[in-house]
Swiss-Prot record:
Stated name of the protein: Small ribosomal subunit protein bS6
Cellular component terms per the entry's GO annotation: cytoplasm; ribonucleoprotein complex; ribosome
Lineage, broadest ranks: Bacteria, Bacillati, Bacillota, Bacilli, Bacillales
PROSITE patterns, per the entry: RIBOSOMAL_S6
Gene3D superfamilies recorded: 3.30.70.60
Organism this protein belongs to: Bacillus mycoides (strain KBAB4)
Length: 96
């Protein structure tokens, strides 16, 4: 298992209830595929560096996880499909 940092941006028009459900759904995708979530940070609504689909803001979420590649691949696949996630990135943390 390796350490990863995942950041994703949720569309700003999503209601708070739906946003929480989306966060729980993607956390579930990771844990159901064998990942262990170490830390979750909600940065909240922030201005984007550039417009994405005519939107200037988004809700930022950051996860630190211990995971295998299968869980990361499944998260990546579902994040690409979901229209409420504007962007996402998965970074493998270097071992010290």
């Amino acid at each position: 298992m390796r350490k990863y940092e995942i950041m994703y941006i949720i569309r700003p028009g999503v209601e708070e209830e739906a946003q929480k459900a989306l966060v729980e759904r993607f956390a579930g995708v990771l844990t159901n595929n064998g990942a262990e979530i170490i830390n979750t940070k909600e940065w909240g609504k922030r201005r984007l560096a550039y417009e994405i689909n005519d939107l200037r803001e988004g809700f930022y979420m950051i996860l630190n996880v211990n995971s295998n590649s299968e869980a990361i691949n499944e998260f990546d696949r579902l994040a690409k499909i979901n229209e409420d996630i504007l962007r996402h990135i998965v970074v493998k943390e270097e071992e010290k």
